[in-house]
Design a protein with these regions (language model features):
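An N-terminal domain-start capping segment
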Residues: 1-12, 99-100, 104, 142, ...
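Non-catalytic, polymerase-adjacent accessory regions of viral genome-replication enzymes
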Residues: 1-54
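A general alpha-helix detector
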Residues: 7-8, 80, 133-137
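Localized chelating/binding microdomains
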Residues: 18-26, 42, 61-63, 67, ...
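Short, conserved non-catalytic motifs in the polymerase core
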Residues: 34-78, 95-97, 153-173
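Active-site-proximal segment of RNA-dependent polymerases
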Residues: 73-120, 124, 169
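Conserved polymerase palm-domain catalytic core
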Residues: 110-186
Length: 186
């Protein structure tokens, strides 16, 4: 395991570019640093595929997804965190979402000619990733417990990864790395 940042003062000075006092203020008042709105979502094809009235009720109509983009100051801090993660922790080779120089086309090409392909869309993916799982990932990749705690508080909201934050995709890729490795062996 690589040793990453072990002290909060180093995190603040070299990655976040803020004082420890400002860090503590943001964490203590994190709800002031996010916007929340509902985004309508519709999947008319799911109702056709499932062809069951109880599913058509949900999937054949609009429902909403909660979006929590951060305000500018926290967004800039999260961009710094994301840059540090991307530059210092190798992304899993099977991760394509949010990874530079990878896209859906490259992902599809690796499955070309396979007899079986499994595809799924995880409903409420980011809300499913709890702050506990994010904290455990930060410790697993090499941050100290104290730094992992601060990073978790800066990158999660209401107990989970927020939809709309610049760090969410990278963190999700890292959180699910052990699961992805298990799936690769099937």
């Amino acid at each position: 395991m690589t040793m990453l940042i072990q002290r909060v003062n180093i995190l603040c000075s070299t990655v976040l570019h803020i004082s420890i006092d400002r860090l503590n203020y943001i964490i203590a008042n994190i709800e002031k640093f996010y916007i929340e709105y509902q985004k309508p979502k519709r999947d008319k094809n799911a109702a056709k595929r499932l062809n069951k009235p109880q599913y058509q009720e949900r999937y054949g109509k609009y429902w909403s997804r909660t979006i929590n983009p951060p305000h500018e100051e926290l967004k800039n801090i999260q961009k710094c965190i994301n840059g540090y993660l991307v530059n210092n922790i190798p992304m899993p080779d099977f991760a394509y979402g949010g990874v530079k120089e990878k896209d859906n086309i490259l992902n599809a090409k690796q499955h070309k000619g396979r007899k079986y392909v499994f595809q799924t869309d995880l409903t409420d993916f980011y809300p499913f990733i709890s702050c506990k799982r994010v904290y455990e990932m930060f410790v697993r990749v090499g941050f100290s417990a104290d730094v992992a705690s601060k990073l978790t508080k800066l990158t999660t909201f209401k107990g989970h990864l927020p939809q709309g934050a610049p760090t969410s995709t990278t963190i999700a890729n890292l959180v699910f790395e052990p699961t992805g490795r298990k799936l690769q062996t099937l």
